[in-house]
Amino acid sequence: MSQVKYNRIILKISGEALAGDKGNGINPTVIGHLANEIKSVHDLGVEIGIVCGGGNMWRGETGAKLGMERAQADYMGMLATIMNGLALQDGLEKVGVPTRMQTSIEMRQIAEPYIRRRALRHLEKGRVVIFGGGTGNPYFSTDTTAALRAAEIGADVILMAKNGVDGIYSADPKTDPSATKFAELTQLDLISKDLKVMDRTASSLSMDTEIPLIVFNVNTPGNIKKVVMGENIGTVIRGDK
């Protein structure tokens, strides 16, 4: 494993990335692509934890704006992340990657409950672990879940896999031709520049734990492997220094 820069990672996959061009739901072709991309990293001996978003199916904030009780809407979002996780688990197992699904809300018929020590043992044995259900608490995003699980398992980095976005820009490059891409930022930069990369709870936790994040385009073949190998793609976000 001397050729890899990061030996244990948290891969945060947005729900939108799982939907692909469809915009919502789960795209089996995308699942297959991601499974092969993750397998290429797993084959290097890297220990991989995965957190899936649920925005391709449901967002708690959206439900709350429509008049639902926020906590109830957030629980629906947690279920969406579990559905995404199960789809990804199926894809990974089809390409021969041993995978375990753990959920913060107990669903013993379909997944293990989240137990930190058990997750660590799975990682040590070369199994990919998918963390579903968010933190298990309403009002917390899956970005916060990624930061939390990264701290709990001692991850070297959080990889923020984005759908068609190859890093962080000063403005939307699709609408502003003068937008510039940042090679490196700090968590304080995200807050001061009001860059909508992750919510402030997730940003604060990442700053406290000093676990770096890398935002990159997951749609480009080989990008996950390139990041793990230390190639300079995407945008690196560090603590407060």
Curated annotation (Swiss-Prot):
E.C. no: 2.7.4.22
One Pfam family this sequence matches: AA_kinase
Positions contributing to UMP binding: G54, D74, T135, G136, N137, P138, Y139, F140, S141, T142
InterPro entries (alphabetical): AceGlu_kinase-like_sf, Asp/Glu/Uridylate_kinase, Uridylate_kinase, Uridylate_kinase_bac
Residues binding ATP: K12, I13, S14, G15, G55, R59, N163, Y169, D172
Metabolic or biological pathway: Pyrimidine metabolism; CTP biosynthesis via de novo pathway; UDP from UMP (UMPK route): step 1/1
GO biological process: 'de novo' CTP biosynthetic process; UDP biosynthetic process
Subcellular compartments: Cytoplasm
Activity control mechanisms: Allosterically activated by GTP. Inhibited by UTP.
Enzyme class label: transferase
MF GO annotations: ATP binding; UMP kinase activity
UniProt xrefs under Gene3D superfamilies: Acetylglutamate kinase-like
Catalytic activity: UMP + ATP = UDP + ADP
Residues spanning the signal sequence: none
Region entry Involved in allosteric activation by GTP, spans: 20-25
Cellular component aspect of the GO annotation: cytoplasm
Keywords on record: Allosteric enzyme, ATP-binding, Cytoplasm, Kinase, Nucleotide-binding, Pyrimidine biosynthesis, Transferase
Subunit structure of this chain's protein: Homohexamer.
Its biological purpose: Catalyzes the reversible phosphorylation of UMP to UDP.
Family to which the UniProt record says this protein belongs: Belongs to the UMP kinase family.
Name used for this protein in its record: Uridylate kinase
Organism: Lactobacillus acidophilus (strain ATCC 700396 / NCK56 / N2 / NCFM)
Name of the encoding gene: pyrH
